[in-house]
Amino acid sequence: FIKVHETGEIVFLETSSRVGGAHLAEMVEASSGINLWKEWAILEVAVATGTEYKLPAVRNDHAGIIVSLTRQEWPDTGNFNDPEITWRMQSMSYHIGLIVQSDSEARILSLLDDYAQRVQSDYHASAPAPDKPSL
C-alpha cells in the first residue's frame, strides 16, 4: 500500500503481474471455470509468438474460500460435508482450507459464515502480535 500525498488516500500498489497466492487461483477456477495458471501460460505464449489470445467461456458461479492456521497438525475436515465443497487443503500441516462453489451467492455466504464460526471454535490457532516489530 502507498499513501497519495496530495489526497491522503491509501491505495494498493501491485509491483508485478502474477497469479495470486493463498489458493485464490483455485477459488477463481471454482467460480469461473478459468484456470489462471493455464491462461497465464497461454497468454505468455500468445505475446511471445504475436498471436491473438482469446479468453475461454467464463462461468458466472459464486465461490468462497476459508483458510486458517490450526491447532491440529493434520485437521480432520470430514465434518465439513456440504456438496458445494470443491477443494480441501490437504498438503499443509497445521492449516485448514476449503473452497465452496454454487450458483447461489446467498448459499456461499451462508456456508462461509458457518465455516468461519466452526473453524474459529474447533481449529483456529494464532499467536499474539509482538509489542514491537522484529527486525
Regions found by a protein language model. Give the residues of each.
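Gly/Ser/Thr-rich active-site loops/lids in small-molecule metabolic enzymes
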Residues: 26-42
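Short, exposed beta-strand "edge-strand" segments with a Pro/Gly-rich flavor and a Y/T-containing core
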Residues: 17, 29-33, 97-103
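Short hydrophobic alpha-helical module
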Residues: 15-22, 34, 43-50
